[in-house]
Regions:
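Active-site microenvironment for binding and transforming phosphate-containing groups
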Residues: 1-223
Length: 223
């Protein structure tokens, strides 16, 4: 388990192989049905209970601004991203398609609408374990690969022998900075899920198992 360094008011962890998120369910939890898109749900006091398990709303991101519920996403090679301020936290499932769609930028636009431009300038971000550049190979002529080469910064992919290798965490970092975050406020774990056997990896054969990014706003709740 990785405990993420956050303000005192926010509790966040990343659950690795053999860690169980069930032990963290001290309050109802929101776990979306992830569809490799860019839909983000704002979870606040008025709507929080309508989204908790066993409900599974279709989304790849959650902006949490209430202490009534916790938020989580599940990954195995896709990048878990957390962006947070003093009293809000956003978690994103940024797989290849989500990164091509720039879900990080969309998330920060949602934060700006709710908290103003300065909220993004002062925010912090954490990019968790995901598949590494050397191990994420795609056919260069495939539709989404072409879209990726059009959308990714050139330094974040390589083309070799009709294959393209994408740097997910590098591109997400670039997107966050382009969207107004300070580079010194973006933390990249650099853990490659494909080569690190403490992680689940879909490409390595973990078809069903997933790791969990979990966050909640404490406000006096037990940790």
């Amino acid at each position: 388990m990785i405990r993420i360094d956050t303000p005192e008011n926010i509790y966040a962890v990343f659950m690795m192989r053999n860690d169980s998120p069930d032990e963290l369910d001290v309050i109802p939890r929101v776990l979306p049905s992830q569809v490799h898109g860019d839909n983000i749900i704002h979870i606040h006091d008025d709507n929080a209970m309508s989204y908790v398990l066993p409900e599974r709303p279709k989304a790849d991101g959650l902006l949490l601004t209430t202490a009534k519920v916790s938020a989580s996403i599940r990954v195995a090679d896709c990048a878990p991203v957390m962006i947070y301020g003093e009293d809000w936290v956003m978690i994103l499932h940024s797989g290849f398609k989500g990164t091509v769609l720039n879900i990080s930028r969309k998330g920060l636009e949602l934060v700006k609408r709710n908290y103003g431009d300065d909220s993004v300038k002062e925010a912090h971000a954490w990019i968790g374990p995901c598949i590494g550049r050397d191990d994420y190979e795609r056919d260069a002529n495939e539709e989404w690969s072409i879209r990726g080469m059009n959308e990714f910064h050139r330094e974040n992919y390589d083309v070799k022998d009709e294959k393209v290798y994408f740097d997910l965490s590098g591109e997400i970092e670039s997107q966050l900075i382009d969207s107004g975050m300070k580079s010194e406020n973006v933390t990249v774990t650099g853990i490659n899920t494909y080569t690190n056997h403490e992680c689940y990896s879909y490409r390595r054969g973990d078809v069903k198992e997933r790791m969990t990014l979990y966050a909640r706003i404490k406000k006096g709740l037990p940790v």
